[in-house]
Amino acid sequence: MSAAVLAILDSDLKAAQPALHKARQVADSTKAPLHVLVNAYSSAMVRAVGVDHERQDAARAQIHKAWQNRISELTDRERCQLSILWHKDSMAALRESILDLQPAMVVVHTSEESGLRRHLFTPRDWQLIRKAPCPVLCVHDRQWPSSPRILAALDPGTEEQPENALALNVLRAADHFASNLSGGLRAAHVLDEMDDSLILLVGEAIPDYSVGMDKVRQFYRDRFQAFATDHGLGPDQITVLTGPVAPTLAKYCEELDMDVLVVGTVHRNLPERLLLGATAESVITRASTDVLVIKPDGFQSPWQA
């Protein structure tokens, strides 16, 4: 049997559960099993019931049954496996379950936390982006149309490393995603340049700087176009953008009403590990586009260290 698509549900029993709906679409389109997971632990119930073990067991059984009924309302129980957990530490429960299940993909409803709270506490989707050993699809409430619009964010390489393996993985994942869901595929490369004030300062110090930057821009445009052509993308499917990566991608996704952005994580040496998933996380906070995060070859999950 192929690896399952794992839908992680929101803990609110009455929530719409967009992660479940989209995980089911992905599973159906790839003929993969669907596994539904929810941590039903309720601290409010624990406080209300107190230390009486019989009352705790009875309350847990009622909550378990309520979740079974709710999931039956949302999907065909016979077509999916169901894990209803009871764990005070929700991230520890997710970690253990994901490592045990080894899913092909994790689908999660992206956090609604405010920007400040995201810096104070690490929400569930950020943890999964950084640490899950498989692709992670972070979804918003908006439903996909019958033909979803898929954008692959690509960095095709540098002069020193002309073939970027992660870019290939991202493009393949985006292509498969679009094909399986009968969607349309586009690809974009973002040239992350200095802001205008810095360019003016550098231009005054180095007279030929602007000419040199034009050559650099053209070099990366040509490299991206060659990469796209080599991998079957037509001129009408590719776009070169300029600006800070995350806000530029988010703005482009909004302007073209993209449904899913496919990005790769950055997993470098120890001092740079905080950068892992930074682009994906920033886009999630800026746009309503769903984000599929692809891990690089040889990715070492901190959960498996």
What feature does the model see in each segment?
Residues H35-L37, Q81-L85, L137, R186-A188, ...:
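General small-molecule cofactor/ligand-binding pocket signal
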Residues V108-Q127, V260-R286:
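Glycine-rich, Arg-bearing micro-motifs that act as flexible, cationic patches
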Residues V107-T110, P135-D141, V291-K295:
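Short beta-strand elements of ligand-binding domains
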Residues M1, A15, E54-R55, S72-V108, ...:
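Structural beta-alpha unit
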Residues M1-E54, R149-P207, P296-S301:
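Small/aliphatic-rich secondary-structure junction motif
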Residues H53-K65, P207-F219:
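A short acidic, glycine-rich active-site loop
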Residues P123-W144:
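Short, structured interface segments
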